[in-house]
Amino acid sequence: MKDWFAGEVAERYDESTADMPVEPVLDFLQPFAGGGALELAIGTGRIALPLAQRGVRVAGIDLSPDMVAQLRKKPGGDEIPVAIGDYATTRVDGSFSLAYILFNSINNQTTQDGQVATFENAARHLEPGGCFVVEVGVPARERLSVFDLSDTHVGVDEYDADTQRLVSHHFTLVDGRWERLSMPFRSVSPAELDLMARIAGLRLHERWNGWKREPFTSESTRHVSVWEKPA
């Protein structure tokens, strides 16, 4: 898996996600995290750091050394153990009552095998009765869709339903010039995720439209799903 978050992408990441909610995410995750939490694709610690500040033992895995370097610059960032590597295969010490992967990061695995391996790796780290939480979008209905539009950034998703290949095109204004970054993903349906979970020995516990437990419906564009490892 390629590191798409090196250099300036890592440096700008916190700014680009500054408007995303944090407290509702923490409120959702914390009740599952009594036995510690493992974040796959921990990145700059947007969620891991405030979760640790609530008293949760947190560890992480991330492919990008530059993203983790941003985490290390923050207060408390050097206290969270992070393994550098592919979150589908990299192991960390210990077991946890919660593993989680957020903000469409499961789609960074661009093959079905990679996504199944992600579930299997999460399950290996879970103690019996532990839960794996995934936040991800529902596959698009349109071939092209604009997901962000501002004076300095335009984001366009290009989706091929036949291959489930999604490419996010980011056009960013930098020093008066527009720069493009195109990142590949594999979009995956809730039903396919449920099957991946079964392969990994997990079972669906709950599914919601968002962090405040809004009902998931046929009109939902994303979901927060929880799978449980049998006790």
Model-derived features: where do they sit?
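Conserved class I S-adenosyl-L-methionine
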Residues: 1-43
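A short glycine-rich, Lys/Arg-flanked "PGG" loop and its adjoining helix->strand segment in the class I
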Residues: 116-128
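SAM-dependent methyltransferase
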Residues: 133-198
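A short acidic, Gly/Pro-enriched loop at the edge of an enzyme's catalytic core
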Residues: 91-98
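A conserved beta-strand element that flanks and buttresses the S-adenosyl-L-methionine
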Residues: 100-102
